[in-house]
Amino acid sequence: IEGFLIELEDRLVDFEDVEFKGIRKSASEIMEFFYEKYTGTPLLDRMGAVMDYFIDEVETLRGRSLNDEEQEIICRKFMNMYVTRDICQIYNWFLEDYGFPALPDMPPERRVLEYEDVYPILYLKYSLTAAGQRKNIRHLVIDEMQDYSYLQYVLLAKMFSCNMTILGDKAQTIAGKQQDVLTFLPKIFGKKVKRI
């Protein structure tokens, strides 16, 4: 999935010039901000950061704050540069790129996901947006560690930056084949893993 996310940076956005009441940003300037200034911002939130910069510039040059309607006009111009912001559509690209059948094409309110699609979609969502980061949680306790997959632990690491206590018995898995989560937990959480 990480390789797909890297390729997605070039595939997800069609850069265009933006002009608002005589103030213009070229596609190449927007691209420079997108790929160089805001690289620490998740991909689906990044254009919003570029847009905020443009709005600040417009307000400074015009000497007044823009009203909600004016900001909405600018917002549409920037957000329309995304080919899509639909996580399920992006997941379908991933599936098709790797030779798997796409999810059925349905409106968001009628979508039903298979269990095996839930965690990859959540991984994409938390990789592409800042949604769901739980910064106010100080400690997380996870029980039955043996029943979580590698991807589920990666998601937990993305969602929670706090300390964690992970409990379980690797010999009591509900999965068909036994996995030793202790082999991959240090890769996900780094050297912060202590085994008791």
Model-inferred region functions:
Residues I1-L5, N163:
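C-terminal, active-site-flanking charged/polar segments
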Residues F4-H139, Q152-Y153:
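Conserved helicase NTPase catalytic core signature
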Residues F100-P101, Y126-H139, Q146-I196:
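Conserved helicase motor core of SF1/SF2 NTP-dependent helicases
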